[in-house]
Amino acid sequence: STRWLIRRRINRLIDEISTRLDIQIKPFQLTKRQVLIDRLVYDPKVVEAIQQNAYERNCPREMVQKEVLAYAREIVPSFNAYLYFRIGYWMAKKVARLLYRVRIGTADEQRYASIDPGSTVVFVINHRSNMDYVLVAFLAAEKTTLSYAVGEWAKIWPLQTLIRAMGAFFVRRNSSDPLYRRVLERYVYMATNEGVCQAVFLEGGLSRDGRLRPPKLGFLDYMLRSYDAQSDRDIVFIPVGVNYDRTLEDRTLLRELDPDAEKR
């Protein structure tokens, strides 16, 4: 059938890509999205949070579980290797080279090559521009796929579909809902524990003046809160510094620092 032929072609592409990547695509990334959603909703710590929340609010457990299901559907990506490498990489490469002359200052290839293939690799990156997502994905595509959190600003069609297909996941950065935070925490831990290579922008937002902002450690906490050094795979953190002669948002960001600037 046509579907079988398409599936066979995609599987062949995935095998071809995985053989040339330093960090291979993990089975977790190729698992059907609905399976991951169900796994997240029925995670023991999420189930415990559902019961606690239902008790505190004095409402049916089923109602809280529906909320959790909505959170899980919002968070879990739908990684598509074909879109990532055939469309996403091509677009990232074109846009990056159109706007900038991209250079790599220094990279310790020897140490990178010595990383245990069974480890989870996390790139820890400073955040200068929204172009960071594009640049880092473009530069890393010869070595690995990247999963990272994206704010609600990108939840517009068709951008959100493409972002999910690229393996990224949406987060409500300012949410104080403990139930939502528990679902997000368990997804991040689940992906980390399964070896998914991730990128973390530790500042949690764009630098306004080029200097590093104080770190927000939420995502690192999610990765490590339930970490068991005896049974879980190693996590290797790789620092990445991104810099620009000029960013696309420089005027907007500088205006935010000027108390006398007219608000737009």
Language model: regions and residue ranges:
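Hydrophobic residues at beta-strand termini and immediately following loops
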Residues: 171
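A cross-family acyltransferase "interaction/gating" segment
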Residues: 1, 5, 13, 28, ...
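Short, well-ordered alpha-helices that flank and scaffold nucleotide-derived cofactor binding pockets
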Residues: 138-141, 225
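Membrane-anchoring hydrophobic helices of lipid-metabolizing enzymes
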Residues: 1-122, 129-138, 160-167, 185-187, ...
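Generic beta-sheet signal
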Residues: 119-125, 196-200
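Non-catalytic terminal/interface segments that mediate subunit docking, oligomerization
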Residues: 123, 127, 139, 148-152
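Short, flexible loop segments at the rims of nucleotide/cofactor-binding pockets, characterized by
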Residues: 97-103, 125, 148, 175-179
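Gly/Ser/Thr-rich loops at beta-strand to alpha-helix junctions
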Residues: 128-131, 205-207
